């Protein structure tokens, strides 16, 4: 496919502004831009319809990049699977550069995986440290997965994502039904907190700590085999159901 570029730029004494249009068969991308001495502002316009909207700002002195993206629908597999472009960029170590400084936020109400919706993903890179903060996604209409204190680290040439995920249960009856939890194990749960380490190279999870309603599970070695069998973001519902039921069997709350 041929790619066409069309520009409409007005140069002024203190600023430059206009549009840059990229087009190919069945697709147009129109950027509105404005440049001053030390800032560049850019955004999409309504020609993209409701599928995608973005706006951003580049500060030149000192350098800082800000970007907000709102998408009508997100393919979660293409975003976080081990073979995705996003994950390949993370593995490339490009973010570990002291000259980079950025904040990127991604929002989408619809996810193409039927069990998830309302994604908010926020990332911040500063001083050679990549952090995911304020990131959350809904599990249907009965739970929220909230990621906090998540940081991308390099250790002995391996790339790790360290952090904590909170499973906030908003409707325990629907939650238990979804995971087919036996009635004898259905307890009055509100929050399950898991501190973890995820190796992006080998797709292996390690669990450092588990809490249920702020009560620490002292010994979860009985879950080690099941946790080691997790295949990163390709983990399926059956594997998670097995781990959850074993965890609830050990919980005396």
Please annotate each region the language model reported:
Residues 1-253:
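Membrane-proximal interfacial segments on either side of biological membranes
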């Amino acid at each position: 496919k041929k790619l066409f570029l069309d520009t409409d730029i007005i140069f002024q004494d203190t600023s430059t502004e206009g549009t840059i249009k990229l087009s190919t068969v069945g697709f147009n991308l129109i950027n509105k831009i404005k440049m001053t001495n030390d800032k560049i502002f850019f955004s999409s316009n309504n020609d993209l319809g409701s599928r995608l909207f973005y706006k951003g700002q580049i500060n030149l002195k000192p350098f800082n990049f800000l970007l907000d993206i709102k998408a009508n629908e997100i393919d979660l597999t293409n975003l976080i699977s081990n073979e995705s472009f996003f994950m390949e960029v993370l593995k490339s170590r490009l973010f570990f550069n002291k000259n980079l400084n950025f904040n990127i936020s991604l929002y989408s109400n619809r996810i193409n995986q039927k069990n998830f919706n309302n994604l908010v993903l926020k990332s911040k890179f500063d001083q050679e440290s990549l952090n995911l903060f304020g990131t959350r996604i809904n599990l249907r209409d009965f739970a929220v997965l909230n990621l906090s204190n998540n940081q991308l680290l390099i250790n002995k040439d391996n790339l790790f994502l360290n952090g904590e995920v909170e499973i906030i249960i908003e409707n325990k009856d629907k939650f238990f039904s979804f995971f087919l939890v036996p009635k004898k194990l259905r307890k009055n749960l509100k929050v399950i907190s898991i501190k973890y380490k995820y190796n992006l190279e080998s797709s292996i999870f390690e669990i450092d700590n588990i809490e249920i309603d702020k009560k620490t599970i002292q010994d979860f070695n009985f879950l080690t085999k099941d946790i080691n069998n997790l295949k990163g973001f390709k983990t399926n519902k059956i594997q998670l159901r097995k781990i959850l039921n074993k965890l609830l069997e050990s919980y005396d709350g």
